[in-house]
Amino acid sequence: MARDIGLNIPAPSEECNDSYCPFHGTLSVRGQILVGTVVSSKMDNTVVIERQYMKLVPKYQRYEKRRSKVHAHNPPCISAKVGDIVTIAECRRISKTKSYVVVKAEVPK
């Protein structure tokens, strides 16, 4: 039985025994919600998400492209793959580099 995580995101149809899953475990989500593309899923239960955004350069009054990479926990019930567009939510620190968890994954068109 999946629990409501407080976001407007439906629970995945699969069940998992992961304690770090926000739907089937005890991990609570709060804070930032980010959207990005999975660029690596080689680590165990971890994905690397790349976000692209525009940053204003005040001197020239123009925007420049920037990107950042974020590590996130990938629960077995979601299992995002490289190229998927994912929504990640902030949670308590899971490891040295992981403070986010994947809550939704979509295959791009």
From Swiss-Prot:
Protein name: Small ribosomal subunit protein uS17
Single GO term (MF): rRNA binding
Role summary: One of the primary rRNA binding proteins, it binds specifically to the 5'-end of 16S ribosomal RNA.
InterPro entries: NA-bd_OB-fold (IPR012340), Ribosomal_uS17 (IPR000266), Ribosomal_uS17_arc/euk (IPR028333), Ribosomal_uS17_archaeal (IPR019978)
Gene Ontology CC entries for this record: cytosolic small ribosomal subunit
PANTHER family listed in its UniProt record: 40S RIBOSOMAL PROTEIN S11 FAMILY MEMBER, 40S RIBOSOMAL PROTEIN S11-RELATED
Keywords: Ribonucleoprotein, Ribosomal protein, RNA-binding, rRNA-binding
Assigned protein family: Belongs to the universal ribosomal protein uS17 family.
Top-level taxon in the UniProt lineage: Archaea
GO terms classed as biological process: translation
Subunit description: Part of the 30S ribosomal subunit.
